[in-house]
Amino acid sequence: MASPIEVRLHMTYPDFTVRTDLTLPGSGITALFGPSGSGKTTCLRCIAGLEKAGQGFIRVHDEVWQDTEKGVFLAPHKRAIGYVFQEASLFPHLSVRANLEFGMKRIPRQQRNIQLPQATELLGIDHLLERSPDKLSGGERQRVGIARALLTSPRLMLLDEPLAALDARRKSEILPYLERLHRELDIPMLYVSHAQDEVARLADHLVLLEAGNVLASGPIRETLARLDLPLAMGGDAGVVIEGTVSAYDRNYQLLSVTLPDSTLCMRVAHAEMQIGTLLRVKVQARDVSLNLQPDDQSSILNRLPVTVMEEALADNSAHVLVKLDAGGTPLLARITRYSSDQLNLHRGQSLWAQIKAVAVLA
């Protein structure tokens, strides 16, 4: 198992203070999520060494990058990072190939873990190598920027809202490439975003920031299901589930997806996928209703036995959020307070969740 990433920061500005005490996974994608001004980019810049925390301790893969108490501060160029900004900032007078080669120059050949052909193939930019940056779309420029960061052979990738400047179509073009990097490269990523759909699709671990403070840090499926956090109170409240494709009905074009560590299964309308494939889906709280008995005379495909774990008032007093356990997988249901009283909901109660819609993320 990869060594964890430790980030302890205390920075004071005239009208803003950042305090973090984080131990993050040394693999996978960790999302730093929160509204504008919550401290996401400040944390990333401190990790990169572009800002120096007044008090700080940063350790990545057992290498200390900053320790204020011991006077340690590793210069940015000595930190093995690949930094991706909102804008790719390519050199306009160089071709795509020359831009990529520029990123490799400071890395000795014997230390290059990623070669040019591998990076261009991973990002799907082989056909762009001889073009100049002004001939690229926004999505293509950003893919080149990501490839350039990879070619520095980083031990850690830092992505600061890399899709924020792109429209929905360009975002949808890049997301599969980020997922591929996640699958095929053993490089941890810290991904800054305020877009919940991106985070739900990409992240394994979620750090929720607000006004410079860490509200929560944990696996995404657990953090999204916490009723004490603002995420559960919004209209997009829901959970992320990573199940396994266990069957496919060609006649009705329905995948059967087995929930993690469970025999429970959901059916999802989707094109055929190989049995055993991991599939990430999102179930919105507003798409889950509750019933005391299984309703077999319904158009709703997914009916799961669940247990009530806890309940909280939603963002208005007419609704409640109910946290449910479906064979070890957390679910959320948003129902009226009246319905909660009619069902006499209480902790430990067994009932049935009816899931009206399941969104395939990846």
Swiss-Prot record:
It catalyses: molybdate(out) + ATP + H2O = molybdate(in) + ADP + phosphate + H(+). GO terms for molecular function: ABC-type molybdate transporter activity; ATP binding; ATP hydrolysis activity. Residues 297-362 form the Mop domain. InterPro entries: AAA+_ATPase (IPR003593), ABC_transporter-like_ATP-bd (IPR003439), ABC_transporter-like_CS (IPR017871), Mo/tungstate-bd_C_term_dom (IPR008995), ModC_ABC_ATP-bd (IPR011868), Molybdenum_import_ModC (IPR050334), Mop_domain (IPR004606), P-loop_NTPase (IPR027417). It is a peripheral membrane protein. Its main location: membrane. The keyword ATP-binding applies. It holds the Pfam family ABC_tran. ATP binds at residues 34-41. It is an enzyme of class 7 (translocase). GO terms for cellular component: plasma membrane. The complex is composed of two ATP-binding proteins (ModC), two transmembrane proteins (ModB) and a solute-binding protein (ModA). Belongs to the ABC transporter superfamily. Molybdate importer (TC 3.A.1.8) family. PANTHER family: ABC TRANSPORTER I FAMILY MEMBER 10, MOLYBDENUM IMPORT ATP-BINDING PROTEIN MODC 2. This is Molybdenum import ATP-binding protein ModC. It comes from Pseudomonas savastanoi pv. phaseolicola (strain 1448A / Race 6). The gene is modC.
